[in-house]
Amino acid sequence: MSHDMTSRELYLRLLTYVRPYWKAFLAALACMGVASLAEPVFPAIMKSLLDDGFSKANGPWDWLFYPLAIMGIFLVRAIFGFLGDYLMSWVSNNVVAELRQAMFARMVRLPTRYYSDNLSGRLMSRIAYDVTGVAGAATNALTSLIKDSLSIVGLLVWLLWLNWQLTLITLSVVPFIAIVVRVFSKRLRSVARGQQESMGKITQVLQEAIEGHKVVKIFGGQSYEEDRFYESIREQRRLAMRATLASAAQSPLVQFFAASGVAIIMGVALKQASSDQTTVGSFVSFVTAMLMLMAPLKRVTDVNAPIQRGLAAAESVFSLVDEETEPDSGKEELGRAQGLVEFDGVTFTYPGSERPALDSVSLTVRPGECVALVGPSGSGKTTAANLLPRFYALDAGEIRVDGHALPNIRLNSLRDNIALVSQDVVLFNDTIGANIAYGGKRDATLDEIRAAAKAAHALEFIDALPEGLNTMIGENGVKLSGGQRQRLAIARAILKDAPILILDEATSALDTESERHVQAALDELMRGRSTLVIAHRLSTIERADRIIALAHGHKQEEGSHAELLAHDGLYARLYRMQKAEEVAV
């Protein structure tokens, strides 16, 4: 996993994303190199000026040379520094965009179990926040590291040429600086991981408060949510201060060792000057180069914190990119299925649960037949619906479509033959037309979309809207009523025209008028399709070809509505209870 990768391995992997932009990357490095290598030219000019300029300047051009040379140096630094920064930023922003795309592409292909086991807020935080951390390491931090490192190398080369003895004294403090940086790097990386987890919790609390704002208001949960949010941001603040403490402590220590080296050097240089072992120009040039060395050295040590944050973020990013996608080892293509669905001794247990949600359940849905699953909460109805499209893998038994075992069928081929309409309608912040013609049907014609909407009894309210099919419906269809949202979901399923249909309590949350429209749309949708209905309101499935009653994951009884009432078992008891409740209301 990515948490086991070293810093070098993480950087090398990041560089694989840089490969498509290698020309711009090399150009950025070249520009930074020119800008950085202009650094030692300034102290070199200072040496020449002090040793030769004042005493040997006779002609008019001698007086202009040094001012023009200094202006030229800083002009070169400015131009090439700008080009280097811009090109490196262009490369890094493209890399970040590709990383986000890679994360999103992997996310939409993750197995359903991953979403059950991981907080959605943390997943959102990884794509939004963690990639930004990589951007910080890839832009500002990386730019500073490259540019300042080249400046340090250039100045050290000049110092070695000028006085190698003094330079060796300078380098003697490097091991101490390296130890400080190494110790603090581990600390900063650890804290950065904690900050990422903390940001995920903040995002989760925000998401729940926003999505559940009506519940928060009705039940007076404002203070409770404020406390939850305060706890999450307090943890983030605590971790931020730990990171600041490590970063702030590192910089003075590095500067102390560097200043100690400078102090020793100045003492030795003064002794050499007193014995005529060095010139004034050489001494001033050496001290100037030493002082110029301090700024890039400080920036290089300061950049350690964002680099460690970036590496911790890269670990998080690659851990998502490396997650295994849904297993899809099937080779068989269904084409358009006839619609024969068979559950044969199916057993499934949710992770962390001791009792199977389904235990040795067998059932058959013949082509064009409507089979309803009923039972109390927790009986396994929705689990059966989730297993047919292979949202989860079975523990035991087998599910077949047209005689083909699910693991042998290509995942896309299987799901192309299944449409789903559930109680929890999912709509996207797009137009009505785009929500009907979603996914594989996005190239549907206007006539096909209108025909699907008409069959779903949705065209009447759509045409009443000023912009019709082009109406934006807001997040999850917030601008529409429950019945309207449900009919759009049915229109989407009608347009898909899949031979197998799953209805998961599709009318349980609707009022009577909305249910009448939706039930009419469902009747249109179910015609000629193999339909598996998960029902809570038993009155909606009286016309089903067969009804299967489940309890505690076991099949209790099977038959038509009339047969099960005559049997006077579980279904009959549930039916009488609901009828009594309806009369009481």
Curated annotation (Swiss-Prot):
Recorded topology in the membrane: Multi-pass membrane protein
Major subcellular location class: membrane
Positions of ATP binding: 375-382
Localisation: Cell inner membrane
GO molecular function: ABC-type oligopeptide transporter activity; ATP binding; ATP hydrolysis activity; ATPase-coupled lipid transmembrane transporter activity
UniProt-listed PROSITE patterns: ABC_TM1F, ABC_TRANSPORTER_1, ABC_TRANSPORTER_2, MSBA
PANTHER family membership: ATP-BINDING CASSETTE SUB-FAMILY B MEMBER 10, MITOCHONDRIAL, ATP-DEPENDENT PERMEASE MDL1, MITOCHONDRIAL
Domains (record comment): In MsbA the ATP-binding domain (NBD) and the transmembrane domain (TMD) are fused.
Name by which UniProt lists this protein: ATP-dependent lipid A-core flippase
Organism: Dechloromonas aromatica (strain RCB)
